[in-house]
Amino acid sequence: MFLDLVQRRNPDLIRAAVALHQRGIIPANTYVIDLDTIMENARAITATSKETGVQTYFMSKHFNRNPIVSAAIVQAGFPGIVAVDVQCAKAQWRYGNPVQHVGHLVQIPKHEIPHVLEMRPEVWTIFSLENAKLLSDAAEAMGMVQDILLRVRAPE
């Protein structure tokens, strides 16, 4: 399905990847990314978000947390990334990419909270009152206030 879309929209990318692989320049299981197209799409999304007043973030897990791709998307106008787990936050932060939203899929472990707070995310998703208390205590100890998003689920 995904490859069909790439074949229609960007056949040159596929041709280049095949040629590079067949010449032994890139090995199998290598990500081949069209950074120009990614930046073009990021600029279009950013322009629309500004027109509509909707805040946007991007998930670097979709391209294996590649810090070069993340930096290009930020350069194109996105404010920062959604870190779906602490490893993602650390990987992006290490390369200077802004981490704007944490805890989206996996809660940040309690002993990692102070380090992630140092990243100054705009928002932090919380799944439970216990995690809210852990975050609040850590933020207060650091003299900070952290905005949160609550993950709400229907009763099971």
Model-derived features with residue positions:
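CE4/NodB-like, metal-dependent polysaccharide N-deacetylase domain
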Residues: R43-E51
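Non-catalytic helical/linker scaffolds that mediate oligomerization, partner binding
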Residues: Q22, R43, H111-P114
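Alpha/beta catalytic barrel-like cores
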Residues: M1-P27
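Non-membrane alpha-helical structural segments and their capping/turn regions in soluble enzymes
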Residues: V32-L35, M39, P67, L129
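Short hydrophobic "helix-edge" motifs at membrane interfaces and signal-peptide entry regions
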Residues: G24-I25, K50-T52
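Glycine-rich, proline-tolerant flexible connector loops at the mouths of alpha/beta enzymes
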Residues: H21-V32, S60-I68
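Active-site-proximal beta-alpha core segment in soluble small-molecule metabolic enzymes
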Residues: Q55-E156
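N-terminal, Lys/Arg-enriched amphipathic/low-complexity engagement segments
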Residues: P27-A28, L35-I38, I45
